[in-house]
Amino acid sequence: MERTLTILKPDCVRKQLIGAVTNMIERAGFRIVAMKKTRLTKETAGAFYAVHKERPFYGELVEFMSSGPCVPMILEKENAVADFRTLIGATDPAQADEGTIRKLYADSKGENIIHGSDSAENAAIESAFFFAAEEVVRVD
């Protein structure tokens, strides 16, 4: 069983889409094994997205991710990383396939509702950023 990390971003929370998006995730066969609502500071958002520090969108991303509450989750499923990337769709909702989370709910490339880990290795690193081992609970 593979795990991935997602974050329902501040725009998702503001639009009151937590339930709708979580429902899509569960209906796609993912198990939620950890979940919390939190608010990132500029410092914690900067640390989480440090890999993008030299990219032109970094400052805007940090501002956005610290603008309100978000909901990180660890998801579990066979082929979780790739399947989840398919479910959420392209970063730019205009390029996302019909029926994907971003096509349905995102407004722009910058405010695109949801984060999904891009590899199993990054999923493990990102999951540890938000969750201690004892917070991850698998229910069979």
UniProtKB/Swiss-Prot annotation:
Catalytic reactions on record: a 2'-deoxyribonucleoside 5'-diphosphate + ATP = a 2'-deoxyribonucleoside 5'-triphosphate + ADP; a ribonucleoside 5'-diphosphate + ATP = a ribonucleoside 5'-triphosphate + ADP
UniProt EC number: 2.7.4.6
GO terms, molecular function: ATP binding; metal ion binding; nucleoside diphosphate kinase activity
Chain residues that bind ATP: K9, F57, R85, T91, R102, N112
Locations listed in the record: Cytoplasm
Record-level GO cellular component terms: cytoplasm
SMART domains named among the record's database cross-references: NDK
Coiled-coil blocks: none
GO BP field: CTP biosynthetic process; GTP biosynthetic process; UTP biosynthetic process
EC category: transferase
Cofactor(s) of this protein: Mg(2+)
Gene3D superfamilies named in the record: Nucleoside diphosphate kinase-like domain
Active site: H115
Protein task: Major role in the synthesis of nucleoside triphosphates other than ATP. The ATP gamma phosphate is transferred to the NDP beta phosphate via a ping-pong mechanism, using a phosphorylated active-site intermediate.
Name used for this protein in its record: Nucleoside diphosphate kinase
Species: Chlorobaculum tepidum (strain ATCC 49652 / DSM 12025 / NBRC 103806 / TLS)
